[in-house]
Amino acid sequence: MNIVAKTIPLVVTTGPHAASTKIHKPGILHPHIRVPMREIAVHPTAGEPPVTVYDSSGPYTDPSHPVLIENGLPRLRHDWVVARGDVEAYEGRHVKPEDNGFATGERLTPEFSVRHQPLKATAGKAVTQLAYARAGIITPEMEFIAIRENLGREAAKEKPTRDGESFGAHIPDYVTAEFVRQEVASGRAIIPANINHPELEPMIIGRNFLVKINANIGNSAVTSSMAEEVEKMVWAIRWGADTVMDLSTGRNIHNIREWIIRNSPVPIGTVPLYQALEKVNGIAEDLNWEVFRDTLIEQAEQGVDYFTIHAGVRLHYIPLTVNRVTGIVSRGGSIMAKWCLHHHKESFLYEHFEEICDICRAYDVSFSLGDGLRPGSIADANDAAQFAELETLGELTQIAWARDCQVMIEGPGHVPMHKIKENMDKQLKTCGEAPFYTLGPLTTDIAPGYDHITSGIGAAMIGWFGTAMLCYVTPKEHLGLPDRNDVKVGVITYKIAAHAADLAKGHPAAQVRDDALSRARFEFRWEDQFNLSLDPDTARSFHDETLPKEAHKVAHFCSMCGPKFCSMRISHDIRAEAQKEGLEAMAARFKEGGELYMPLPTPASAE
């Protein structure tokens, strides 16, 4: 192994959130599994138990776990994978100069310090969670997910109150491992979990589960380093990203990705076409199946959990984009369109799709079928090019399913609010209810610098309608490469959208955190308000800008209204007065008068 000797600062953000404790729930079918969650303690005066929330942050928020980035995370799934008896270790391909963009010397990012032999399926076997689910097998991954999705709840003794409109989704009161298996077997959900990513804590993407979010990271030819990208990944999952896509397009793609995967407890996705393009010096016309196939195997051996494949961009669809306002805005879509036009032939991604499936089933890499012809402006939303590609994605889904490969479908894009539901309805019908994974959509084009908001609106809507995972958009969208703070803003924005969608769909546990925070707000438990929020640091900071003293943390007002105009304080006074006089007496008095307010005097009484 050729490791360049140079020092790189390997410091990432660690430590728990305020008032939070990492807990682990054991399995029943698979007692060895330990499912992580976060408990948020509330003040003793509340008389309430801690609030349990979903936790995708991995060991980085666990004080009992020593973080050594150089060693990577514990390989918790390795024994699960090997125990199934259908994989074999092999030497694997060796790193080539082109894998890292021909970087050398000081420009070359060091290789990760530990190399494990990759695993692949034994001859004739499919090692995908879909294959196991179809065979009736409940894997440890499936039970892990069932426990995780229940947010620490035990099986409900009483039917929970359901309030929402699910638009045909069937969210159970309590998620069982068998329900997870059924959803995966049907293709309505996927478990992105490459057998070569044992560090991963299993999660699920599907319409009948909690809405998930993805954060994009990655270097470019202009900026960013390995240390920055690993920290971006850790930072993104700290604030709630469920998956991370490494969209690196500069040098050192292979080595940076290795560092990310070895330290990631969440699924990692990529667009293999980006690295393949780097291998041919950025010349799209020089791409070919052999280079792309080699790149797929390279990334599958590293442990990439899902591939975005733009196989739906077909030669005869390209003319449909000519009259668009913004043409083809997908990087992968534009690369393949350029290749198709130059060679005047069908895309090699489409022509070799069955071979791509064979690679994915040998490592359990899930498909994220790319929307290369998605609209890049609201003027182009729901046009012929977009929906023609969607039809092809539906065909490719059936091909992948026939080979036991897991599939989700990528969606737009830029779509005004009144056209969003049509996207969801068409996707469900065309793609057999495979999970939908959308970028926003952005609902207006007039707000550069605020596209996390324009897209958050669309994300909440399409998540409610049935999208399973939302790809975040940061304030830097269309403007530049996001930094650490942009990543946080994007993640928090999309956590809001996903949670709002869960509430609207009627998820049985979604409102627990809202109600706990509302009670804390009404009772002026300021610290509980901060700690129960999605971003305690910002909430506390905003409060302390005007009321910084510790005494203000118990005050029955904030700087918005002050002590005299606080509606909640006045409500407390009303309640206290009602209790003092007696609720029944007050009710009787109002009933006798028939009015809340004193009636006007009649002419007779005036005399």
Swiss-Prot record:
Cellular component, GO annotation: cytosol
Binding-site residues for substrate, renumbered to this chain: 216, 245, 274, 310, 330-332, 371-374, 410, 437
EC number in record: 4.1.99.17
Cofactor list: [4Fe-4S] cluster
Binding residues annotated for [4Fe-4S] cluster, in chain numbering: 558, 561, 566
Coiled coil: none
Keywords: 4Fe-4S, Iron, Iron-sulfur, Lyase, Metal-binding, S-adenosyl-L-methionine, Thiamine biosynthesis, Zinc
Cofactor note: Binds 1 [4Fe-4S] cluster per subunit. The cluster is coordinated with 3 cysteines and an exchangeable S-adenosyl-L-methionine.
Catalytic activity line of the entry: 5-amino-1-(5-phospho-beta-D-ribosyl)imidazole + S-adenosyl-L-methionine = 4-amino-2-methyl-5-(phosphooxymethyl)pyrimidine + CO + 5'-deoxyadenosine + formate + L-methionine + 3 H(+)
Listed GO MF terms: 4 iron, 4 sulfur cluster binding; carbon-carbon lyase activity; zinc ion binding
InterPro entries the UniProt entry points to: ThiC (IPR037509), ThiC-associated_dom (IPR025747), ThiC/Bza_core_dom (IPR038521), ThiC/BzaA/B (IPR002817)
Biological process according to GO: thiamine biosynthetic process; thiamine diphosphate biosynthetic process
Binding site for Zn(2+): 414, 478
One Pfam match: ThiC-associated
Pathway(s) annotated for this protein in UniProt: Cofactor biosynthesis; thiamine diphosphate biosynthesis
Role summary: Catalyzes the synthesis of the hydroxymethylpyrimidine phosphate (HMP-P) moiety of thiamine from aminoimidazole ribotide (AIR) in a radical S-adenosyl-L-methionine (SAM)-dependent reaction.
Record note on quaternary structure: Homodimer.
HAMAP family hit by this protein: ThiC (MF_00089)
Similarity comment: Belongs to the ThiC family.
Designated name of the protein: Phosphomethylpyrimidine synthase
Lineage: Bacteria, Pseudomonadati, Pseudomonadota, Alphaproteobacteria, Hyphomicrobiales
